Amino acid sequence: MSEHETAGEGRFNSIEVRVLGSLIEKQATSPESYPLTLNALVLACNQKTSREPVMNLTQGQVGQALRVLEGQGMTRLQMGSRADRWEHRVDKALELVPAQLVLMGLMFLRGPQTLNELLTRSNRLHDFDDTEQIQHQLERLISRGLALHLPRQAGQREDRYTHALGDPAEIEAILAARQQEGGGRSGGSVSEERIEALEARIAALEARLAELEG
């Protein structure tokens, strides 16, 4: 799939994910300049810090992503006398509480992360007391098919969590990489079970999004 194509109904490609994550972050960290102009959003998407991977998007790419997301009810354009500005609608579209919105934003921007990483990286965005609070909110997201739990593999000390709204091919690539990482320690049947469980969560997500769009 090309970067310029939509990831399918209810799914977002890598550019759309970066756009949503950047809007969520800037709403919390730069409220004085939010909603964002297109130029400010491009700069936010291409930041060298707090982004994994670092991207180099053009105004055309970001503008196209915004139009696709607007059609899905995820962003909204605010017309202004000086400049048009964009805001996200993720919390309203997906019915998220503030804590869940922050976690989704972090996972949009940096992919799979541990509970401790999410706690550290959320300190400017939301006041979580500890990793237990984060895990509770993640479990609620997982139950709705919006996030995935990735059990730790060989050489890793902690489990990781990521959002489940990306391109299915990208999710499958993550799963395949983790299967290879864990191949030396766990048998193929365990990896297959994990993949089947994650595929079930993806199916649940598709059903949930179909409900929202209906």
From Swiss-Prot:
Gene3D superfamilies, per the entry: Winged helix-like DNA-binding domain superfamily/Winged helix DNA-binding domain
InterPro entries: DUF480, WH-like_DNA-bd_sf, WH_DNA-bd_sf
Signal sequence segment: none
Name of one Pfam family that matches: DUF480
Top-level taxonomic group: Bacteria
Homology family: Belongs to the UPF0502 family.
HAMAP family xref list: UPF0502 (MF_01584)
Name of this protein: UPF0502 protein Pput_3252
Native organism: Pseudomonas putida (strain ATCC 700007 / DSM 6899 / JCM 31910 / BCRC 17059 / LMG 24140 / F1)
Lineage of origin: Bacteria, Pseudomonadati, Pseudomonadota, Gammaproteobacteria, Pseudomonadales
